[in-house]
Amino acid sequence: MADTALVDHSPHHPTKAPRLETASNVILIDNYDSFTWNVYQYLVLEGATVTVIRNDEISLEELIAKKPTQLVVSPGPGHPKSDAGISNAAIQYFAGKIPIFGVCMGQQCIIHSFGGKVDVTGEILHGKTSVLKHDGRGAYEGLPPSVIITRYHSLAGTHSTIPECLEVSSFAQLGEDADKTVIMGVRHKQFAVEGVQFHPESILTEHGQTMFRNFLKLTAGTWEGNGKDVAQGGNFTAAAPNPPKATKKVSILEKIYDHRRAAVAKQKTIPSQRPSDLQAAYELSVAPPQISFPDRLRQSAYPLSLMAEIKRASPSKGLIAEHACAPAQARQYAKAGASVISVLTEPEWFKGSIDDLRAVRASLEGLTNRPAILRKEFIFDEYQILEARLAGADTVLLIVKMLDTELLTRLYLYSQSLGMEPLVEVNTPDEMKIAVDLGAQVIGVNNRDLTSFEVDLGTTSRLMDQVPESTIVCALSGISGPKDVEAYKKDGVKAILVGEALMRAPDTAAFVAELLGGQSKKLPLQSRNSPLVKICGTRTEEGARAAIEAGADLIGIILVEGRKRTVPDDVALQISKVVKSTPRPTPYPTEVPQGDTDATSVDYFDHSATTLRHPTRALLVGVFLNQPLSYVLAQQQKLGLDVVQLHGSEPLEWSRLIPVPVIRKFGLDEFGIARRAYHTLPLLDSGAGGSGELLDQMRVKQILKSDDGLRVILAGGLDPLNVTEIIKQLDESGYKIVGVDVSSGVETNGVQDLDKIRSFVQAAKSAF
């Protein structure tokens, strides 16, 4: 606007209106903005009785107790998600109860509170006047179609994320582009909740007093209660700069798709996340190892394979499990028998991220037959597929409905080039034909129409006759119980995807067993009759032989210079010969796995503990303390060590560089005890070992309870007289002790006592 067009619209020598009894207790939340008091002035001039409260000086309970007649949320600096104090909680509580009006950040809080997103507009405006187009309803009732407004903002609600419960009530042109607009007003379709992005209280805004007056006329929490019909009408759409866009009904899929396109385009410009950055990382072979998605789907302990989904929210159900921990959920699914874990990585509607997938992949490290990992996302670019592979995905989702045939084919072939067979999703006969013609090995039939988000569980069955026999068909969406699954078994469906029902299940394993018609596949607890017993500090052939004949599983020799129990290499070699030539008194039975054991996932420590038990003889353990890796490797070869024990502060990574199982000692407050796929088993001990100092049993309990899959060897002050009692004190966590380690507890005057060795082994074996 030219300067000559600037008009001061502020009240000149104003006369305060009589007290408005229906606005006798208006609460104005101050988001620390100087305009708050201009808003206050306009409200008071209309007869309202107003109390101003800063956003961080009142709790929601205190605000509720004040029983406001109307709520006004002021402008303010920052972002509504992080800088609005009580504003969002107040809007969420009072919506539908009393009228609410938001100004600038106040409107952004409304959008954020109902699930929309506030982001940068590309403009930074400070005292800029614009032409407003509005729908003539709510705050705009009685105003001319075009109004001059004043804007102070760089953030605004984004068109693609405005939730279904809100409608855009006004807009302004974005910059010089007549085809692009910025949201200037929103209104709830049911509740008397309205916001404006501009400043009606500014002296350069036309009809600002009228807007506040219209708001203060409202007394009920809903439009119906106020006798108002605020459904958008023809006047607003006719005033829009691009009428077809304003009137078109946009599906949820289109909204999500548009939002993801914008987000991915922006992400691709960030240094370290550019396509060239991802490709360079991939060429360095840093992507985690992968498994075959189709092959894993063919392995299941149940009649149908389970694709278990990690799903915090959805457009149709809203929040499902907002605070769910993705890696913890993944471990539950794996133990319950899932063949595939689907990780939703879309952040706005489903509340997921690629970081969830990365954490899930890490959490499954070391499982004997881990589930395949699916990136469940709205994929339209090779970039997203490469990103998924680098994060640890074994497969990705390609939705036929949102991709033309050329793009679908390109993405399918690119995914295959990275070793990932995609899951191709269809919903109609035409889409199924496209997937079959593509040659997809795995086709998912979505029972939910992504245009309307309505569920029809019969969709999968109706499309089965189009599918080649060799193709794996998965039923997706809406499955909540055993009855939903029965028809799929009869129709030849090979897998089902379950999300919400699993996320809400109190017992994941029991729910899966009931759903799929099998027995709950809970992992067996370590046998309490066969703990590993390690006799450490062995210095003679006689001591080694006595320990083995008593039933010990592990014979430890100290290979650390300067320790009183250290043995020289020549003695170590003699002990090694004894260990390898002396048979167990009773061989352990060698069990051949039966049935479908390879179709299930066994936690790392349950599996690794079995590698420390030889069926016919004991194993020789060499104990090292902060010595060079090269020395450890040389001694392992020279002495024929079966196991290496690292008893100092050696890096965890060494465990992967040593060619035999590794026991690693941990103090009670040391990080990394439960880290999978490195050390074979952690050993809990105090100090440098051999001190005879008992561990704090309460702290041991806490450690064991912190991780269901943790298994440890217990050391520290054990002897023949206390080992049984100490194990019993651990109560229900005792089964996680898969072995015990003793040194000074079987000595007399610093020398190994053969009778004590025999007594300790007997006591330890009977303690479980």
UniProtKB/Swiss-Prot annotation:
Pathway: Amino-acid biosynthesis; L-tryptophan biosynthesis; L-tryptophan from chorismate: step 1/5; Amino-acid biosynthesis; L-tryptophan biosynthesis; L-tryptophan from chorismate: step 3/5; Amino-acid biosynthesis; L-tryptophan biosynthesis; L-tryptophan from chorismate: step 4/5. L-glutamine binds at G76, P77, G78, Q108, S154, L155. Induction: By tryptophan starvation. Keywords: Amino-acid biosynthesis, Aromatic amino acid biosynthesis, Decarboxylase, Glutamine amidotransferase, Isomerase, Lyase, Multifunctional enzyme, Tryptophan biosynthesis. The keyword Cell division does not apply. It catalyses: N-(5-phospho-beta-D-ribosyl)anthranilate = 1-(2-carboxyphenylamino)-1-deoxy-D-ribulose 5-phosphate; 1-(2-carboxyphenylamino)-1-deoxy-D-ribulose 5-phosphate + H(+) = (1S,2R)-1-C-(indol-3-yl)glycerol 3-phosphate + CO2 + H2O; chorismate + L-glutamine = anthranilate + pyruvate + L-glutamate + H(+). InterPro entries: Aldolase_TIM, Anth_synth/Amidotransfase, Anthranilate_synth_II, Class_I_gatase-like, GATASE, Indole-3-glycerol_P_synth_dom, Indole-3-GlycerolPSynthase_CS, PRAI_dom. One of its GO terms (molecular function) is indole-3-glycerol-phosphate synthase activity. Residues 25-225 form the Glutamine amidotransferase type-1 domain. CDD domains: GATase1_Anthranilate_Synthase (cd01743), IGPS (cd00331), PRAI (cd00405). Its EC number is 4.1.3.27, 4.1.1.48, 5.3.1.24. It comes from the Eukaryota. Residues 532-768 are annotated as: N-(5'-phosphoribosyl)anthranilate isomerase. The active site is at C104 (nucleophile), H199 (for gatase activity), E201 (for gatase activity). One of its GO terms (biological process) is L-tryptophan biosynthetic process. Residues 252-516 are annotated as: Indole-3-glycerol phosphate synthase. Trifunctional enzyme bearing the Gln amidotransferase (GATase) domain of anthranilate synthase, indole-glycerolphosphate synthase, and phosphoribosylanthranilate isomerase activities. This is Multifunctional tryptophan biosynthesis protein. It comes from Emericella nidulans (strain FGSC A4 / ATCC 38163 / CBS 112.46 / NRRL 194 / M139) (Aspergillus nidulans).
